[in-house]
């Protein structure tokens, strides 16, 4: 709860407490606050024990921290058993394959040609067995000239400016 309070903030709170309550009332106030916190903890612990005793022996491994929705979901999903098939879903969203498909599309290659080129580079005999050969040299008519400027299209007329409308 107070993990993000630094030394400077703690010192500032101490100085403010001395200024607000005064040095003569501060020790009594600290004792009252610590006594109240202890009573709250005792009440909480006794309530937890009462609930555990009323639930019976089948719930002896019950943890109240599991009632927090974040920890419940984290415990159920990150546990070792994969009853819901989440591993298959994670594998179906393989981003490496999608990124390679996008880069192939940007480079102007089809995904089948890139798969054949990748298998030929990796030394796989699957491409040679199919009888499909892929040339890895560039040909002038198939690759677009990216350095050439695209012809500019005629821009449509702008609508008239209406000063009263703005």
From Swiss-Prot:
InterPro entries: TatA/B/E, TatB
Keyword Cell membrane attributed: yes
Regions of compositional bias (Low complexity) in chain numbering: 117-129
A cellular-component GO term for this protein: TAT protein transport complex
Domain of life where this protein originates: Bacteria
Keyword Cell membrane among record annotations: yes
Bilayer disposition of the protein: Single-pass membrane protein
GO biological process annotation, one example: protein transport by the Tat complex
Subcellular location(s) of the protein: Cell membrane
Bias (Polar residues) ranges: 132-142
General function of this protein: Part of the twin-arginine translocation (Tat) system that transports large folded proteins containing a characteristic twin-arginine motif in their signal peptide across membranes. Together with TatC, TatB is part of a receptor directly interacting with Tat signal peptides. TatB may form an oligomeric binding site that transiently accommodates folded Tat precursor proteins before their translocation.
Subunit: The Tat system comprises two distinct complexes: a TatABC complex, containing multiple copies of TatA, TatB and TatC subunits, and a separate TatA complex, containing only TatA subunits. Substrates initially bind to the TatABC complex, which probably triggers association of the separate TatA complex to form the active translocon.
Similarity comment text for this entry: Belongs to the TatB family.
Name of the protein: Sec-independent protein translocase protein TatB
Phylogenetic lineage: Bacteria, Bacillati, Actinomycetota, Actinomycetes, Kitasatosporales
Gene label: tatB
